[in-house]
Amino acid sequence: MLDVSNFERMRIGLASPEQIRAWSSGEVKKPETINYRTLKPERDGLFCERIFGPTKDWECHCGKYKRVRYKGIVCDRCGVEVTRAKVRRERMGHIELAAPVSHIWYFKGIPSRMGLILDMSPRSLEKVLYFVAYVVIDPGDTPLVKKQLLTEAEYREYRDKYGNAFRAAMGAEAIKELLQEIDLDQLAAELRQELKESSGQRKIRALRRLEVVEAFRSSGNRPEWMIMDVIPVIPPELRPMVQLDGGRFATSDLNDLYRRVINRNNRLKRLLDLGAPDIIVRNEKRMLQEAVDALIDNGRRGRPVTGPGNRPLKSLSDMLKGKQGRFRQNLLGKRVDYSGRSVIVVGPELKMHQCGLPKEMALELFKPFVMKRLVDKGLAHNIKSAKRMVERVKNEVWDVLEEVISEHPVLLNRAPTLHRLGIQAFEPVLVEGRAIQIHPLVCTAYNADFDGDQMAVHVPLSAEAQAEARLLMMAAHHILNPKDGRPVVSPTQDMVLGAYYLTTVSKGARGEGKAFSSYDEAYMAYLNKVIDMHAMIKVRQEDGQLLETTIGRLIFNREIPIPKELGYYNCEVDKKKLTEIIARCYQLLGTEATATLLDGIKKVGFHYSTLAGFTIGIDDIVVPGDKKEIIAETESAVEKIDQQYRKGLISEEERYQKVISLWNNATDTLTKKLMAGMDKFNPVFMMANSGARGNVQQIRQLAGMRGLMADPSGRIIDLPIKANFREGLTVLEYFISTHGARKGLADTALRTADSGYLTRRLVDVAQDVIVREDDCGTTAGIEVREIQEGNQVIEKMEERLAGRYALEDVRHPETGELLVAANTMIDDDAARAIVQAGIKTVKIRSVLTCKTRYGVCRKCYGRDLATGREVEIGEAVGIIAAQSIGEPGTQLTMRTFHTGGVAGDDITQGLSRVEELFEARKPKGQAIIAETTGTITAITEVRGRREIEITDDSGEKFSYQVPYGSRLKVAEGDHVEAGDELTGGSVNPHDLLKVKGVRGVQLYLLREVQRVYRLQGVDINDKHIEVMIRQMLRKVKVEDQGDTDLLPGSLVDAFDFEDANRKVQEIGGKPATARPVLLGITKASLATDSFLSAASFQETTRVLTEAAIKGRVDPLLGLKENVIIGKLIPAGTGMSRYRQLKLVTPAVDQEEDGAEAVDMATGK
């Protein structure tokens, strides 16, 4: 067999009949499978041992030769080779067909490749192939035309008239003869000539034919190979037959399909030998063609062949397609050994890098390691007795298990794994019970809670795998979230509450104003109840300074302990503050210190939230006294508006808007009163204020009023819910509430599926983007400024600058001082300095302009958000980007919000908008954009429709019709730039590409995607979105081929296009011209260089058909292709630069059985 790790690229093509015969180990002549009495395979049948190899290791069919010593002998009685049974997984057979048949992929696929190369319509092809009509092969000297179709009657008539002067035939033989006659070079020349001369439909047709002809020419495939004389039979182990309990057999559908082909083929052979009448033979040939079609792609033409219970049989194509197909089920995701799963519970005493593993689980997972250690320590004589000891769970086993698992990390995974933090490594600690314990702080990353969630454990076996788990995947290293570079392990709930309670100040508490000589003295006073935890006191520091603080804050700083470098935190510490402390600690002191700090916060937080003894009761929900007045005032104002409406002074729409804004104001006023009137130590208030649980909106609903609700369509009902949950709702109010709740649940269910599919498409389009070099040397970049929506800042300038490389020197506009030199990274301080200097735009290096082929360079990507340092070569930034965009997808709201009113403002939001942008679809409610830079000279109204006229600088006029009901964004006399929106709505990115070019559309997409996420309160770094947009703009469409070999109208990779032009220009030829195209992510994934990646994504058969005809070569550059063929992925430590390294492990002297133990331990 082929050595998997030893080839560079993979090629797909059409197989010639000779090649199929060369693969085969023998011809399958009979449809029998196994003998029903002996249950042994029948000779020459579909499971024949002579063809495919023995069913038992080292044993022939008749039993003359048994045992290894006869290896390689072919038995003289039964003809079976004595070898391993696993050759039945790789040896193929073949069926010699009595008549050629066409391959359904090439005749029925869209476009029909056979039809294009013969210049026949698929319909007429079908007539010939399925014996409905004759096709003229050689007209001789008759008035017939080559490839003309004749019905039965016409054929007879011409036969009578001209005798044998012409040749016509039907079926695949006829098509095969026509295909054999094609001279590809001559045909290509003719088509190129026709391209130059024709136009319109004919030109398009010629182009499509030329594409297929060129594919055949360049790949070395012959057109007649689309017709098959021989059919390969796949190895029997890949279409197994197994005996069930009841003595019946279950078999793969393929065996049924093959059996039909063999039966019909044998019948056809017999009929031909007998010299049966033409019509019978023809019918049999047609049935053979249909049987082969069903085998290759059942259901593609006509009704599918069904098995028992009317279920369509699974053909070879179905084996590859879809989620259950070979690609997605077995090649991209495999089941693994050395794994287990169990319910999770919290382990508050664990360190950041630990997890609790149940004893029985650990023993089973580490069994081989334990067995080897038992032998090494002399507690067992050989592996067999060690195995017995483990199975009987002897006492010594537990001590050995402790030794084995120390320093051996395990991986914990929680489904759904939405981003890379869904799998992390921990050091196991043995625990009693049967539940896995996990550290409370990693719950955020896993999105785990303890209401019955389960997690899976995996054991990395090899030394390399353990090293990677320890150095790259340890939970203590994953402090920052790759999507925005903020800490992902900040404390939540109880811990936040504890820290907040500890650092709050209470006015006039016991012992306020007292002074102490040291921390210890103050702490003793606190323990003896002389001072209250929240009282402001003065304490002398070690440096002699008097510090005014509370004992709680001293404890917070001392007990955690907060590192000296971060200073003393003398303030209320809520969730935001805690996150900030962690982020600063990580920046200044690195991973180890942060992990220690986190464990400290966890301990102190839990301890003091317990001491605080929080409870909430109905009395803690205080309804403000002036609620009645606020509501009464609003009601009377609403009544006035209703009167105005009834008098006809205002329209229904105005009334609706006014009522809604009145009630919203009332709710806001009430909320402000409510929050102001709450006691600072009210438990409900403390929970919300500290960020532990709940928020102002929820308190408002408990103690203020529920406010306005939306109906099922999303329109706000202008009748508010005036009650709150403390007072209780009336029946009507309750009914109105249910709309929103139901919609929320339905939305969530739909959103999860949509978001998962979006992530899958994003991963697919960006999976081959890896950091491949240090600097691509580009001189281009993008200009960044802050993103605004109306008067609200969506993304601040410094967020966009931090961690990127400056393209040119950035100087202070007034002093001229150099803030950042060109090609150096802008760190957080520099970004702040730039913003403070009042600089509004900065040019930075960006992924969008990176010149690296098949990836990006370190300088264009900038900082790796998960580590806060410059990105490493080999980082799979494409997949990280896809996960960062996809993971928050579930949080985005689904539907279009019809916020009452403003016509034309109905633009899609939330997840659907993100999808619309990444798929580059034409948006609903499209905005009109200016094609040129100029001034608006007139806005006129023609028959109820408005028209905008723009005059550009040269005096040329452009006019645009505004559809009825659209909102204008411009007025007469305004100056507009090319690409500016003239009306409200979303811009069609394809139009923008034409008007503003690549850079314009890139920045537009980036801004729009950011807008959706930011307005939902999700922060994603620009660079992740940039990676995706770059993938969408990789291709160009050739317009004029010049002297290159490129075909006009074809999509080519931008880098390939430049290469082709460079080659032509070097020899002084005319370069080709092309225009950039914007592809949606699905299209871009299918247009990738790798056919393996595209085929495993969607439309498997279409991708493979095209790839085979073109003889595509997969360079195996992406991650997916390499996973599919089982190689190491070319990222991280799998990059070629690390491949040459050999891992040396110090050898231990072992006896015979010791060596065997090593083999078992590595799972070989």
From Swiss-Prot:
Q: Which Gene3D superfamilies match?
A: 1.10.132.30, 1.10.150.390, 1.10.1790.20, 1.10.40.90, 2.40.40.20, 2.40.50.100, RNA polymerase II, clamp domain, RNA polymerase Rpb1, domain 3
Enzyme's top EC category: transferase
Keywords carried by this UniProt record? DNA-directed RNA polymerase, Magnesium, Metal-binding, Nucleotidyltransferase, Transcription, Transferase, Zinc
GO aspect biological process, one term: DNA-templated transcription
Cofactor (UniProt): Mg(2+); Zn(2+)
Q: Which GO terms describe its molecular function?
A: DNA binding; DNA-directed RNA polymerase activity; magnesium ion binding; zinc ion binding
Q: GO cellular component annotations, sorted alphabetically?
A: DNA-directed RNA polymerase complex
Which Pfam families did the record assign? RNA_pol_Rpb1_1, RNA_pol_Rpb1_2, RNA_pol_Rpb1_3, RNA_pol_Rpb1_4, RNA_pol_Rpb1_5
Give me the comment on cofactor binding.
Binds 1 Mg(2+) ion per subunit. Binds 2 Zn(2+) ions per subunit.
Which residues are listed for Zn(2+) 2 binding in this entry? 776, 850, 857, 860
What Enzyme Commission number(s) does the record list for this chain?
2.7.7.6
So where does Mg(2+) get bound? 449, 451, 453
**Catalytic function, reaction form:** RNA(n) + a ribonucleoside 5'-triphosphate = RNA(n+1) + diphosphate
Give the residues the record marks as binding Zn(2+) 1: 60, 62, 75, 78
**Which PANTHER family does the annotation name?**
DNA-DIRECTED RNA POLYMERASE, DNA-DIRECTED RNA POLYMERASE SUBUNIT BETA
Assembly notes: The RNAP catalytic core consists of 2 alpha, 1 beta, 1 beta' and 1 omega subunit. When a sigma factor is associated with the core the holoenzyme is formed, which can initiate transcription.
Q: Which family does it belong to?
A: Belongs to the RNA polymerase beta' chain family.
Function as written in the Swiss-Prot or TrEMBL entry: DNA-dependent RNA polymerase catalyzes the transcription of DNA into RNA using the four ribonucleoside triphosphates as substrates.
Q: What is this protein called?
A: DNA-directed RNA polymerase subunit beta'
Its source organism is Moorella thermoacetica (strain ATCC 39073 / JCM 9320)
Gene encoding the protein:
rpoC
